[in-house]
Protein backbone atom coordinates (compact mmCIF):
# COMPACT_ATOMS: atom_id res chain seq x y z
CA UNK A 1 0.00 0.00 0.00
CA UNK A 2 1.16 3.53 -0.84
CA UNK A 3 0.73 6.53 1.46
CA UNK A 4 -1.59 9.30 0.22
CA UNK A 5 -1.37 11.90 3.00
CA UNK A 6 1.12 14.01 1.02
CA UNK A 7 -0.88 13.57 -2.20
CA UNK A 8 -3.86 15.65 -1.06
CA UNK A 9 -3.97 19.00 0.69
CA UNK A 10 -6.12 17.87 3.63
CA UNK A 11 -3.40 15.33 4.53
CA UNK A 12 -5.73 12.68 5.92
CA UNK A 13 -4.08 9.34 6.74
CA UNK A 14 -4.91 7.01 3.85
CA UNK A 15 -3.25 4.57 1.47
CA UNK A 16 -3.89 3.19 -2.00
CA UNK A 17 -3.08 -0.15 -3.60
CA UNK A 18 -1.07 1.33 -6.49
CA UNK A 19 -0.07 4.74 -7.83
CA UNK A 20 0.90 5.81 -11.35
CA UNK A 21 2.45 9.17 -12.25
CA UNK A 22 1.50 10.14 -15.79
CA UNK A 23 4.21 12.34 -17.33
CA UNK A 24 3.60 11.86 -21.07
CA UNK A 25 0.36 11.80 -23.05
CA UNK A 26 1.97 9.08 -25.17
CA UNK A 27 1.60 6.75 -22.19
CA UNK A 28 -2.15 7.29 -21.76
CA UNK A 29 -3.24 4.64 -24.25
CA UNK A 30 -1.08 2.05 -22.49
CA UNK A 31 -2.80 2.48 -19.12
CA UNK A 32 -5.03 -0.43 -18.14
CA UNK A 33 -7.52 1.62 -16.07
CA UNK A 34 -8.43 -1.41 -13.98
CA UNK A 35 -11.25 -0.56 -11.60
CA UNK A 36 -11.30 0.86 -9.09
CA UNK A 37 -9.09 3.77 -10.14
CA UNK A 38 -9.09 7.46 -9.28
CA UNK A 39 -7.79 10.34 -11.42
CA UNK A 40 -5.87 12.83 -9.27
CA UNK A 41 -4.37 16.23 -10.01
CA UNK A 42 -2.76 18.16 -7.17
CA UNK A 43 -5.23 16.81 -4.61
CA UNK A 44 -6.47 20.24 -3.55
CA UNK A 45 -10.13 19.30 -4.00
CA UNK A 46 -9.92 15.64 -2.98
CA UNK A 47 -10.14 14.10 0.49
CA UNK A 48 -9.16 10.47 0.94
CA UNK A 49 -11.44 9.66 3.86
CA UNK A 50 -10.40 5.98 3.92
CA UNK A 51 -7.85 3.66 2.34
CA UNK A 52 -8.54 3.38 -1.39
CA UNK A 53 -8.45 -0.20 -2.65
CA UNK A 54 -7.46 0.73 -6.17
CA UNK A 55 -5.01 2.65 -8.36
CA UNK A 56 -4.49 6.40 -8.13
CA UNK A 57 -3.40 7.96 -11.44
CA UNK A 58 -1.60 11.27 -10.87
CA UNK A 59 -1.65 13.67 -13.82
CA UNK A 60 1.80 15.24 -14.20
CA UNK A 61 1.53 16.39 -17.84
CA UNK A 62 3.30 19.73 -18.37
CA UNK A 63 3.62 22.34 -21.10
CA UNK A 64 2.01 25.61 -22.27
CA UNK A 65 1.69 26.88 -25.85
CA UNK A 66 0.56 30.46 -26.61
CA UNK A 67 -0.72 31.44 -30.06
CA UNK A 68 -1.38 35.12 -30.70
CA UNK A 69 -4.28 35.78 -33.06
CA UNK A 70 -5.80 38.99 -34.37
CA UNK A 71 -8.21 39.67 -31.53
CA UNK A 72 -7.33 37.05 -28.93
CA UNK A 73 -4.78 34.65 -27.54
CA UNK A 74 -5.23 30.90 -27.87
CA UNK A 75 -3.46 29.12 -25.02
CA UNK A 76 -3.07 25.36 -24.78
CA UNK A 77 -2.04 24.18 -21.31
CA UNK A 78 -1.25 20.63 -20.22
CA UNK A 79 -3.50 19.31 -17.47
CA UNK A 80 -0.74 18.89 -14.89
CA UNK A 81 0.28 22.55 -14.87
CA UNK A 82 -0.28 24.33 -11.56
CA UNK A 83 -3.29 26.63 -11.99
CA UNK A 84 -2.04 29.67 -10.08
CA UNK A 85 1.38 29.56 -11.74
CA UNK A 86 -0.38 29.36 -15.11
CA UNK A 87 -2.55 32.41 -14.32
CA UNK A 88 0.43 34.35 -12.94
CA UNK A 89 2.53 33.58 -16.02
CA UNK A 90 -0.23 34.84 -18.34
CA UNK A 91 -0.58 38.01 -16.26
CA UNK A 92 3.19 38.58 -16.52
CA UNK A 93 2.80 38.37 -20.31
CA UNK A 94 -0.12 40.88 -20.21
CA UNK A 95 -2.55 38.16 -21.31
CA UNK A 96 -5.57 38.83 -19.15
CA UNK A 97 -8.98 37.44 -18.24
CA UNK A 98 -8.13 34.85 -15.60
CA UNK A 99 -6.82 37.25 -12.92
CA UNK A 100 -9.98 36.85 -10.76
CA UNK A 101 -9.06 33.16 -10.50
CA UNK A 102 -5.60 33.78 -9.07
CA UNK A 103 -4.56 31.51 -6.20
CA UNK A 104 -7.35 29.02 -6.87
CA UNK A 105 -5.68 25.77 -5.78
CA UNK A 106 -5.20 22.81 -8.08
CA UNK A 107 -4.12 22.04 -11.62
CA UNK A 108 -5.20 23.21 -15.06
CA UNK A 109 -6.88 19.86 -15.72
CA UNK A 110 -9.02 20.18 -12.60
CA UNK A 111 -10.32 23.64 -13.57
CA UNK A 112 -12.91 22.46 -16.13
CA UNK A 113 -14.01 19.54 -13.93
CA UNK A 114 -15.16 21.91 -11.19
CA UNK A 115 -15.76 24.83 -13.54
CA UNK A 116 -13.77 26.78 -10.99
CA UNK A 117 -14.95 30.27 -10.25
CA UNK A 118 -14.17 33.20 -7.99
CA UNK A 119 -15.03 36.89 -7.71
CA UNK A 120 -17.53 36.86 -10.55
CA UNK A 121 -15.56 34.82 -13.09
CA UNK A 122 -15.97 31.18 -14.10
CA UNK A 123 -13.25 29.42 -16.06
CA UNK A 124 -15.80 28.06 -18.56
CA UNK A 125 -16.14 31.57 -20.00
CA UNK A 126 -12.68 31.22 -21.51
CA UNK A 127 -12.46 27.51 -22.30
CA UNK A 128 -12.41 26.77 -26.02
CA UNK A 129 -11.70 23.04 -25.93
CA UNK A 130 -10.77 20.18 -23.63
CA UNK A 131 -8.70 17.28 -24.94
CA UNK A 132 -9.10 13.99 -23.09
CA UNK A 133 -8.77 10.24 -23.33
CA UNK A 134 -12.20 8.60 -23.25
CA UNK A 135 -11.55 5.68 -20.92
CA UNK A 136 -14.86 3.98 -21.71
CA UNK A 137 -14.57 4.17 -25.51
CA UNK A 138 -10.75 3.98 -25.56
CA UNK A 139 -10.26 6.93 -27.90
CA UNK A 140 -9.13 10.56 -27.91
CA UNK A 141 -11.80 13.26 -27.83
CA UNK A 142 -11.76 17.04 -28.28
CA UNK A 143 -14.71 18.56 -26.45
CA UNK A 144 -15.96 22.10 -27.08
CA UNK A 145 -17.66 24.28 -24.49
CA UNK A 146 -21.12 22.86 -25.19
CA UNK A 147 -19.92 19.26 -24.92
CA UNK A 148 -18.39 20.04 -21.53
CA UNK A 149 -21.89 20.92 -20.19
CA UNK A 150 -20.61 23.58 -17.81
CA UNK A 151 -22.78 24.74 -14.92
CA UNK A 152 -22.16 26.25 -11.49
CA UNK A 153 -19.20 24.26 -10.08
CA UNK A 154 -20.17 21.46 -12.42
CA UNK A 155 -19.40 19.86 -15.78
CA UNK A 156 -19.86 16.62 -17.68
CA UNK A 157 -16.51 15.54 -16.24
CA UNK A 158 -17.81 15.91 -12.71
CA UNK A 159 -21.12 14.24 -13.56
CA UNK A 160 -19.27 11.21 -14.96
CA UNK A 161 -16.15 10.87 -12.81
CA UNK A 162 -13.49 8.57 -14.19
CA UNK A 163 -14.88 8.62 -17.74
CA UNK A 164 -12.32 11.03 -19.22
CA UNK A 165 -8.67 11.66 -18.42
CA UNK A 166 -8.08 15.29 -19.33
CA UNK A 167 -4.68 15.89 -20.93
CA UNK A 168 -4.92 19.54 -22.01
CA UNK A 169 -7.21 22.57 -22.00
CA UNK A 170 -7.41 25.30 -24.66
CA UNK A 171 -8.32 28.80 -23.48
CA UNK A 172 -9.28 31.80 -25.63
CA UNK A 173 -8.54 35.14 -23.96
CA UNK A 174 -9.72 38.26 -25.84
CA UNK A 175 -7.28 41.14 -26.29
CA UNK A 176 -10.17 43.51 -25.57
CA UNK A 177 -9.93 42.90 -21.83
CA UNK A 178 -12.73 44.07 -19.54
CA UNK A 179 -12.39 44.05 -15.74
CA UNK A 180 -14.90 42.06 -13.68
CA UNK A 181 -15.27 43.88 -10.38
CA UNK A 182 -18.88 43.52 -9.22
CA UNK A 183 -17.97 41.18 -6.32
CA UNK A 184 -16.52 42.54 -3.06
CA UNK A 185 -13.83 43.58 -2.42
CA UNK A 186 -13.07 44.24 -6.09
CA UNK A 187 -16.06 46.61 -6.28
CA UNK A 188 -14.26 48.87 -3.82
CA UNK A 189 -11.15 49.39 -5.94
CA UNK A 190 -10.50 53.06 -6.63
CA UNK A 191 -9.17 54.78 -9.74
CA UNK A 192 -8.02 52.91 -12.84
CA UNK A 193 -8.61 49.20 -12.32
CA UNK A 194 -5.93 47.20 -14.11
CA UNK A 195 -5.65 43.44 -14.45
CA UNK A 196 -2.58 43.58 -12.20
CA UNK A 197 -4.54 45.42 -9.50
CA UNK A 198 -7.27 42.76 -9.63
CA UNK A 199 -4.68 39.97 -9.55
CA UNK A 200 -2.87 41.50 -6.55
CA UNK A 201 -6.11 42.17 -4.67
CA UNK A 202 -7.43 38.64 -5.20
CA UNK A 203 -4.13 37.13 -4.04
CA UNK A 204 -4.05 39.38 -0.96
CA UNK A 205 -7.65 38.61 0.01
CA UNK A 206 -7.33 34.86 -0.53
CA UNK A 207 -4.15 34.74 1.53
CA UNK A 208 -5.91 36.55 4.38
CA UNK A 209 -9.14 34.54 4.27
CA UNK A 210 -7.89 31.07 3.43
CA UNK A 211 -5.30 29.14 5.43
CA UNK A 212 -2.18 27.99 3.60
CA UNK A 213 -2.69 24.22 3.15
CA UNK A 214 1.05 23.71 3.64
CA UNK A 215 0.65 25.10 7.18
CA UNK A 216 -2.95 24.16 8.03
CA UNK A 217 -4.18 21.26 5.87
CA UNK A 218 -7.45 22.11 4.09
CA UNK A 219 -9.16 21.81 0.71
CA UNK A 220 -10.43 25.37 0.35
CA UNK A 221 -14.20 25.86 0.20
CA UNK A 222 -15.72 22.62 1.45
CA UNK A 223 -19.32 23.36 0.43
CA UNK A 224 -20.92 24.91 -2.64
CA UNK A 225 -22.88 28.12 -2.23
CA UNK A 226 -26.45 26.81 -2.65
CA UNK A 227 -28.71 28.19 -5.36
CA UNK A 228 -32.36 28.72 -4.38
CA UNK A 229 -35.42 30.29 -6.02
CA UNK A 230 -36.93 33.66 -5.13
CA UNK A 231 -39.80 32.09 -3.19
CA UNK A 232 -37.35 30.29 -0.90
CA UNK A 233 -35.35 33.50 -0.60
CA UNK A 234 -38.37 35.54 0.49
CA UNK A 235 -39.15 33.03 3.21
CA UNK A 236 -35.60 33.01 4.53
CA UNK A 237 -35.31 36.82 4.46
CA UNK A 238 -38.32 37.06 6.76
CA UNK A 239 -36.37 34.91 9.20
CA UNK A 240 -32.90 36.34 8.53
CA UNK A 241 -33.13 39.83 6.94
CA UNK A 242 -29.33 40.17 6.81
CA UNK A 243 -28.70 36.87 5.04
CA UNK A 244 -26.01 37.24 2.36
CA UNK A 245 -26.97 36.25 -1.18
CA UNK A 246 -26.13 37.08 -4.80
CA UNK A 247 -28.49 37.22 -7.79
CA UNK A 248 -28.01 34.65 -10.54
CA UNK A 249 -29.94 33.97 -13.73
CA UNK A 250 -33.50 32.64 -14.09
CA UNK A 251 -35.15 33.99 -10.95
CA UNK A 252 -32.65 32.33 -8.63
CA UNK A 253 -30.08 33.53 -6.11
CA UNK A 254 -26.91 32.09 -4.66
CA UNK A 255 -26.78 32.03 -0.85
CA UNK A 256 -23.47 32.41 0.97
CA UNK A 257 -22.98 29.02 2.61
CA UNK A 258 -20.32 30.48 4.89
CA UNK A 259 -22.87 32.97 6.24
CA UNK A 260 -25.33 30.16 7.02
CA UNK A 261 -22.67 28.15 8.83
CA UNK A 262 -21.46 31.11 10.85
CA UNK A 263 -24.96 32.42 11.60
CA UNK A 264 -25.94 29.04 13.05
CA UNK A 265 -23.04 29.16 15.49
CA UNK A 266 -21.01 26.50 13.74
CA UNK A 267 -17.83 28.52 13.28
CA UNK A 268 -16.39 26.85 16.38
CA UNK A 269 -17.66 23.37 15.49
CA UNK A 270 -15.25 20.45 15.46
CA UNK A 271 -15.13 16.66 15.51
CA UNK A 272 -11.82 15.25 16.65
CA UNK A 273 -9.14 17.24 14.83
CA UNK A 274 -11.45 18.31 12.01
CA UNK A 275 -12.75 21.83 12.55
CA UNK A 276 -14.38 24.84 10.93
CA UNK A 277 -11.80 27.47 10.07
CA UNK A 278 -12.35 30.36 12.54
CA UNK A 279 -11.56 32.95 9.83
CA UNK A 280 -13.70 31.53 7.00
CA UNK A 281 -16.62 29.26 7.90
CA UNK A 282 -16.80 27.73 4.43
CA UNK A 283 -13.39 26.11 4.96
CA UNK A 284 -12.91 22.98 7.06
CA UNK A 285 -9.41 22.29 8.38
CA UNK A 286 -7.26 19.48 9.73
CA UNK A 287 -5.92 20.89 13.01
CA UNK A 288 -3.38 18.11 13.50
CA UNK A 289 -4.30 14.47 13.04
CA UNK A 290 -7.86 14.47 11.71
CA UNK A 291 -9.22 11.22 10.31
CA UNK A 292 -11.61 10.60 7.46
CA UNK A 293 -14.31 9.84 10.00
CA UNK A 294 -13.68 13.17 11.76
CA UNK A 295 -14.19 15.18 8.59
CA UNK A 296 -17.24 13.29 7.34
CA UNK A 297 -18.95 13.52 10.73
CA UNK A 298 -18.23 17.25 10.94
CA UNK A 299 -19.54 17.82 7.42
CA UNK A 300 -22.72 15.85 8.16
CA UNK A 301 -23.23 17.79 11.39
CA UNK A 302 -23.04 21.10 9.50
CA UNK A 303 -25.27 19.86 6.68
CA UNK A 304 -27.96 18.65 9.10
CA UNK A 305 -28.06 21.85 11.16
CA UNK A 306 -28.23 24.03 8.04
CA UNK A 307 -30.98 21.83 6.57
CA UNK A 308 -32.98 21.86 9.80
CA UNK A 309 -32.76 25.64 10.14
CA UNK A 310 -33.17 26.73 6.53
CA UNK A 311 -34.43 23.82 4.44
CA UNK A 312 -31.27 24.17 2.35
CA UNK A 313 -29.21 21.05 1.73
CA UNK A 314 -25.55 21.98 1.44
CA UNK A 315 -23.52 19.99 -1.06
CA UNK A 316 -19.79 19.36 -0.67
CA UNK A 317 -17.70 21.07 -3.33
CA UNK A 318 -14.79 18.76 -2.51
CA UNK A 319 -14.57 15.14 -3.63
CA UNK A 320 -14.55 12.51 -0.90
CA UNK A 321 -12.87 9.22 -1.81
CA UNK A 322 -13.47 6.05 0.19
CA UNK A 323 -12.44 2.43 -0.18
CA UNK A 324 -13.94 1.90 -3.63
CA UNK A 325 -14.28 5.41 -5.04
CA UNK A 326 -16.32 8.56 -4.53
CA UNK A 327 -18.42 8.86 -1.38
CA UNK A 328 -21.64 10.92 -1.34
CA UNK A 329 -22.71 12.70 1.84
CA UNK A 330 -26.40 13.24 2.51
CA UNK A 331 -28.65 13.83 5.50
CA UNK A 332 -32.39 13.47 5.87
CA UNK A 333 -34.28 16.75 5.72
Swiss-Prot record:
GO terms for biological process: cell division; cell wall organization; peptidoglycan biosynthetic process; regulation of cell shape. InterPro entries: FAD-bd_PCMH (IPR016166), FAD-bd_PCMH-like_sf (IPR036318), FAD-bd_PCMH_sub1 (IPR016167), FAD-bd_PCMH_sub2 (IPR016169), MurB (IPR003170), MurB_C (IPR011601), MurB_C_sf (IPR036635), Oxid_FAD_bind_N (IPR006094). It is found in: Cytoplasm. The active site is at residues 153, 221, 317. One of its GO terms (molecular function) is UDP-N-acetylmuramate dehydrogenase activity. It catalyses: UDP-N-acetyl-alpha-D-muramate + NADP(+) = UDP-N-acetyl-3-O-(1-carboxyvinyl)-alpha-D-glucosamine + NADPH + H(+). Keywords: Cell cycle, Cell division, Cell shape, Cell wall biogenesis/degradation, Cytoplasm, FAD, Flavoprotein, NADP, Oxidoreductase, Peptidoglycan synthesis. Its main location: cytoplasm. Coiled coil: none annotated. Pathway: Cell wall biogenesis; peptidoglycan biosynthesis. Its EC number is 1.3.1.98. Residues 12-176 form the FAD-binding PCMH-type domain. It holds the Pfam family MurB_C. GO terms for cellular component: cytosol. The keyword Zinc-finger does not apply. Gene3D superfamilies: 3.30.465.10, UDP-N-acetylenolpyruvoylglucosamine reductase, C-terminal domain, Uridine Diphospho-n-acetylenolpyruvylglucosamine Reductase, domain 2. PANTHER family: UDP-N-ACETYLENOLPYRUVOYLGLUCOSAMINE REDUCTASE (PTHR21071:SF4). Cell wall formation. Belongs to the MurB family. This is UDP-N-acetylenolpyruvoylglucosamine reductase. It comes from Idiomarina loihiensis (strain ATCC BAA-735 / DSM 15497 / L2-TR).
